A protein has these predicted regions:
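Pepsin/retropepsin-fold aspartyl endopeptidases
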Residues: 1-127
């Protein structure tokens, strides 16, 4: 068991040719995906709002949030996902929001993303 990485292409939704590929750590404990801000700015992404965050070490921080087109290599699918502009030396993290958007869950035993059935609204939606 343990952490694993997947290859992700990150693109500007307004100009998809402006993009980069990187290995992202799959992090189900992170709500948002996290990318060094400089890399996002290089492809022309701008923030749409700020978000207060609690980091893994317990520190509180306010960071900028934007939206990017993510293509996860092993899924061969592209969706727009929220992304945090991290410090320039930060790790590349694929967070829970992106995983849910793609309808996948992390399976650390085989180090792969696996499809899951989406739950819509619980009890109220089933009425």
């Amino acid at each position: 068991m343990g952490m694993f990485q997947v290859k992700v292409q990150v693109a500007n939704p307004d100009d998809p040719k402006r993009s980069f590929e990187e290995l992202f750590w799959v992090d189900t404990g992170a709500l948002y995906s996290y990318v060094p801000g400089k890399r996002l700015e290089e492809i022309g992404l701008t923030s749409i709002r700020s978000r207060k965050l609690v980091l893994a070490d317990g520190r509180h921080e306010t960071r900028q949030l934007g939206e990017a087109r993510f293509t996860i290599d092993e899924l061969n699918e592209t969706l727009t996902c929220p992304v945090i502009f991290g410090p320039d030396d930060s790790l590349y993290l694929l967070g829970a929001t992106a995983l849910e958007n793609f309808g996948v869950d992390a399976d650390p035993t085989i180090k792969k993303l696996k499809p899951v059935a989406a739950i819509i609204g619980g009890f109220l939606a089933s009425r």
